[in-house]
UniProtKB/Swiss-Prot annotation:
Keywords: Membrane, Transmembrane, Transmembrane helix, Transport. InterPro entries: MFS, MFS_dom, MFS_trans_sf. This is MFS-type transporter efuF. PANTHER family: MAJOR FACILITATOR-TYPE TRANSPORTER HXNP (PTHR43791:SF9), PERMEASE-RELATED (PTHR43791).
Length: 493
């Protein structure tokens, strides 16, 4: 009969550990993890107060700068740049081309040169492109800026997710990613309020959307300059930790995060992880929820505008759904970390958005404005959570740092590619209801829900199989981080 294994099994679990010099942590290979909760709490507190806020602020501007075309469109962007037909949708598609293709290369560079260097560099690049957009006078100039912006923004989300996996344990990751990613929901609310204020400016020759680009681009560049100085490259070089905390922080990661910390960059090893069959299924799931996330991020103002509001009120009425989305995001990710469970939480979040799109498809906007606006709340409530739980999920099941760098870059690229599908689906000829686009998005979301639940069931089945082989019942957090081929490894389902 299977027996339960206590969570603290550090003295029973053999773990292959290597430091920078390649020496094992001890003769027996047993990791000595400090049990003093005060030290662990101090480490988490310092990371939560000194690392997370800056990363969240950086991603706030990442999301604002990426999605500000939605606000600019409501202020006459297309008219000022003499855009016709589907040129707005094409602009969004071209952004996603560079945004998706360069995720893996950017994350490989981050692994090689560290997040301390690469994350601020990427931010400086896209901030410059945002600022330059205020000087464009035609569609061609806008495309050039958006292509370059996509190139610089590529790898930032993946880079931060990977970067966080080198500081936080597996059961701490989803909540921290949600706090960081919650900036995207705040960005939606903040950009709506900012656009509301900026569009009140009446200048004889400069339209309001250009002032928006100037303000957002300048703020991005200033924050990137500060990040160069503030960000640490690893737990061992973190200036906020005492020597004892540095040692414990490293042991925390070895026990429940990575096979090896500060692992030397190895391109062949990193890319080899992409050949696993599970990566293809993860990628399809990423694309599925990515379509919905991009649709909400890029077109929520247009969906709200269906209610008949003018430019100012449309941007103002997008604030509340984003705020609700932020609260739901934090609640679901806290629950996901607490229960060490990903698939059911992920499917539940996707279901909210699925129902929201179904309502928008079936409701008569003019006759039922209240339910239509409620559907927008459902969209925001479920559009942002999937990214946090999904990227926590595949990182939890990839113990190698090199592997996580490659897989995270690939998965972020896959999920971002949903933006291409979304941008093509929201053709201007189907405005203002965009029914075909809503149907496409709901279909992808429905397929994704089925795949997530099936994948989670497979992980649970394989964990039970491993329990039977070993004759013990082991939970994911009961054992130190080992190779997935090790008999004691357990998947996060």
């Amino acid at each position: 009969m299977a027996t339960s294994v206590e969570a603290d099994t550090k003295s029973q679990v053999n773990l292959k550990v290597a430091n920078d010099g390649g020496e094992s942590a001890s003769e027996t290979g047993v990791v000595d993890v400090y049990d003093d909760p005060l030290i662990h709490n101090s480490i988490r507190k310092k990371l939560d107060l000194k690392l997370l806020p800056l990363l969240s602020a950086m991603y706030l501007f990442n999301a604002i700068d990426r999605s500000n075309l939605g606000n600019a469109k409501t202020d006459g962007l297309e008219k000022d740049l003499h855009m016709k037909g589907n040129e707005y949708s094409i602009t969004l598609v071209l952004f996603y081309v560079t945004f998706c293709l360069l995720d893996v290369p950017a994350n490989m560079l981050l692994k090689k040169f560290s997040g301390k260097i690469m994350l601020p560099t990427l931010m400086m690049g896209w901030g410059s492109m945002t600022l330059i957009q205020c000087a464009v006078h035609n569609w061609g100039g806008l495309i050039a800026c958006r292509l370059l912006m996509g190139a610089f923004e590529a790898g930032f989300m993946a880079g931060v997710v990977y970067y966080l996996t080198t500081f936080y344990r597996r059961n701490e990751l989803a909540l921290r990613i949600s706090i960081f990613y919650g900036a995207a929901t705040i960005a939606g609310a903040f950009s709506g309020l900012l656009a509301y204020g900026v569009f009140q400016i009446n200048h004889p020759s400069i339209p309001g959307w250009k002032f928006l680009m100037i303000i957002e681009g300048s703020a991005t560049i200033l924050l990137a300059s500060f990040a160069y100085w503030h960000l640490p490259s690893s737990v061992l070089s973190c200036k906020w930790f005492t020597e004892e905390e540095k040692h414990v922080a490293e042991q925390r990661m070895l026990h429940d995060g990575s096979i090896q910390t500060d692992e030397k960059f190895a391109l062949k090893t990193a890319l080899a992880n992409l050949l696993d069959w599970k990566i293809a299924l993860y990628a399809v799931i990423g694309i599925s929820y990515g379509v919905a996330s991009a649709s909400v991020g890029n077109f929520l103002p247009q969906m709200v505008q269906r209610l008949g509001f003018g430019t100012v009120k449309t941007n103002l009425y997008t604030v509340a759904p984003y705020c609700v989305g932020c609260v739901i995001l934090l609640a679901q990710c806290t629950s996901s970390d607490h229960f060490r469970e990903r698939s059911t939480h992920l499917a539940g979040a996707m279901l909210l958005t699925f129902v929201g799109f179904i309502l928008l498809i079936t409701l008569d906007t003019e006759a039922q404005p209240g339910p239509t606006y409620f559907a927008c709340f459902l969209l925001a409530a479920g559009a942002f959570t999937p990214s946090c739980i999904f990227h926590s999920w595949h990182n939890n099941n990839t113990p190698s740092e090199n592997g996580r760098a490659a897989v995270t870059g690939f998965m972020v690229g896959a999920s971002n590619s949903g933006g291409i599908i979304s941008s093509l689906a929201f053709a201007s000829k189907t405005a203002p209801k965009y029914i075909p686009a809503l149907i496409v998005t709901a279909t992808f979301q429905g397929v994704g829900i089925v795949l997530v639940l099936g994948f989670g069931a497979w992980f649970r089945w394989d964990n039970r199989r491993r329990d039977r082989v070993q004759g013990v019942r082991i939970r994911t957090g009961d054992v130190a981080t080992v190779s997935v081929d090790d008999a004691s490894w357990r998947w996060t389902a």
